Amino acid sequence: MPLLRKYEIMILLTEEFNDSELKTWVFNYAKNLRKFSVCDISVISRGKHNLAYPIETKMKGNYIQLNFSSMPKYITNFSKTLKMDSNVLRFLVFNKQL
């Protein structure tokens, strides 16, 4: 059985999303994660907040938290997908297992 590790990704999206568009974006990204045999996906919307400093001239952003289990070799693929998305201002991947 392959070694699964628990990860958390915090994603900062542009503020242009309304609630339904945000849900659609998250659903599509979660569907993309499932292609890599990701399991135990949970999504938490942290809401829209003011940024401490402008990022690409944006002053607000939507925060999304994704928790899931995956094989370590796929994390690079997830990161590349997020880097190519123009709606993503920043993201950070945490390994939740010590």
Curated annotation (Swiss-Prot):
<dbReference type="InterPro" id="IPR000529">
    <property type="entry name" value="Ribosomal_bS6"/>
</dbReference>
<dbReference type="GO" id="GO:0005840">
    <property type="term" value="C:ribosome"/>
</dbReference>
<dbReference type="GO" id="GO:1990904">
    <property type="term" value="C:ribonucleoprotein complex"/>
</dbReference>
<comment type="similarity">
    <text>Belongs to the bacterial ribosomal protein bS6 family.</text>
</comment>
<protein>
    <recommendedName>
        <fullName>Small ribosomal subunit protein bS6c</fullName>
    </recommendedName>
</protein>
<dbReference type="GO" id="GO:0070181">
    <property type="term" value="F:small ribosomal subunit rRNA binding"/>
</dbReference>
<keyword id="KW-0687">Ribonucleoprotein</keyword>
<keyword id="KW-0699">rRNA-binding</keyword>
<dbReference type="InterPro" id="IPR020814">
    <property type="entry name" value="Ribosomal_S6_plastid/chlpt"/>
</dbReference>
<dbReference type="GO" id="GO:0009507">
    <property type="term" value="C:chloroplast"/>
</dbReference>
<dbReference type="InterPro" id="IPR014717">
    <property type="entry name" value="Transl_elong_EF1B/ribsomal_bS6"/>
</dbReference>
<keyword id="KW-0934">Plastid</keyword>
<keyword id="KW-0150">Chloroplast</keyword>
<comment type="function">
    <text>Binds together with bS18 to 16S ribosomal RNA.</text>
</comment>
<dbReference type="GO" id="GO:0003735">
    <property type="term" value="F:structural constituent of ribosome"/>
</dbReference>
<dbReference type="Pfam" id="PF01250">
    <property type="entry name" value="Ribosomal_S6"/>
</dbReference>
<keyword id="KW-0694">RNA-binding</keyword>
<dbReference type="GO" id="GO:0006412">
    <property type="term" value="P:translation"/>
</dbReference>
<keyword id="KW-0689">Ribosomal protein</keyword>
<dbReference type="InterPro" id="IPR035980">
    <property type="entry name" value="Ribosomal_bS6_sf"/>
</dbReference>
